Structures are given as C-alpha cells and as structure tokens.
C-alpha cells in the first residue's frame, strides 16, 4: 500500500557502483521511520536535474537536511515530491 508523508532528507549518495554504473541513493527520516530510494538502473543528468528542480535546489550537496514529500511502498521510496507544490519525480 502506498503512503505519502513529509520527510527530512537524511543523506544523499551519488557515485559509481562496482560495475562503474552511476548510482544515486537518498535516505529520509519520516513518520514511517528511515526509508531510502533504491535507484540503481540507468541514471543520467536529466534524472538528477529533475530531482533538483522538483525540490527547487541547485546542487546535489544541498539535499541533506532539506524537506520533501515522499511516496513509500513497503520500506521503499517510489516518488519524491515538492513540499508545497504538486510536483513529483517517480523513481
């Protein structure tokens, strides 16, 4: 079942996995506890830009300690949204 909640971004990771593929991961603290994204498939600059634009930020390094809305299924974040506006990025 999908749940929506406000969350604080606890950490952000942008790097390469053992195969050299670009990986991102975001951890969130919310009423459901600590949850995280699990995006390890093809990631490009457009996807990263979409996250930053949705959260109205200019730099990946600014993500920790910012607030967002998240959609959670189980313990996995499936979408990240703007806290005020109806803007979402599906993961």
Short names for language-model regions:
Residues 1-91:
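Short beta-rich binding modules
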């Amino acid at each position: 079942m999908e749940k929506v909640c406000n969350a604080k971004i606890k950490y952000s990771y942008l790097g390469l996995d053992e195969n050299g593929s670009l990986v991102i991961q975001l951890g969130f603290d919310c009423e459901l506890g600590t949850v995280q994204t699990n995006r390890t498939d093809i990631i490009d600059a457009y996807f990263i830009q979409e996250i930053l634009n949705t959260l109205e930020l200019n730099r990946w390094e600014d993500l920790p300690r910012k607030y967002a809305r998240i959609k959670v299924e189980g313990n996995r974040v499936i979408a990240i949204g703007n806290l005020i506006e109806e803007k979402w990025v599906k993961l």
